[in-house]
Amino acid sequence: MTCSILMIETHQNLNSQKNIIVEDLTVTYRNGHTALRSASFKIPEGSIAALVGVNGAGKSTLFKALMGFIPSSRGKISLLGYSVKDALKNNLIAYVPQSEEVDWDFPVLVKDVVLMGRYGKMGLMRRARPEDLAIVNKSLERVGMLDFEDRQIGELSGGQRKRVFLARALAQEGKVILLDEPFTGVDVKTETNY
């Protein structure tokens, strides 16, 4: 099975070091299954791109490799001139996975979930500054969830939860935002607006 990169909007040139560069990337799981084989592509900084493919084509595996969640068997990843480890350390990447592993019964408010996106920028004590709270509000507003900020995450529909996690990624202010199946469970009106 294959997947393709669809360039939707490009702003920079492909020769810049400020690209997402994947060269000959192969990911083989411990059970011997190769989920991604020899993937290579460049996406210029400032571009909007879509990874398109059928179920099982390796899209989620690629995102997990870009995030450093799973090791590659072979190949190289450069994110805006940084290794995956350094890009993560410098808060350059925000990620919304296909599905969140969350205890929906845990009593956490929507605004606190989005505030988690600021943890990398808030410093050691993780105290929210007024500018962090303003970014949280702006992110919730962008996804149409500001009116739900004081609701518990477990009270929301699947599409609303997805929008909250998108707001968390926006609050991170990463240079790269990876969205795995971003519109699963989201209504058509919301999908059209974002």
Region locations from a protein language model:
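Conserved ABC transporter NBD signature motif
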Residues: G75-L88, I93
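A short, flexible loop at the N-terminus of ABC-type nucleotide-binding domains that lies
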Residues: L6-S38, I43-S47, M125-R126
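Conserved ABC ATPase "signature" region
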Residues: L115, P130-F148
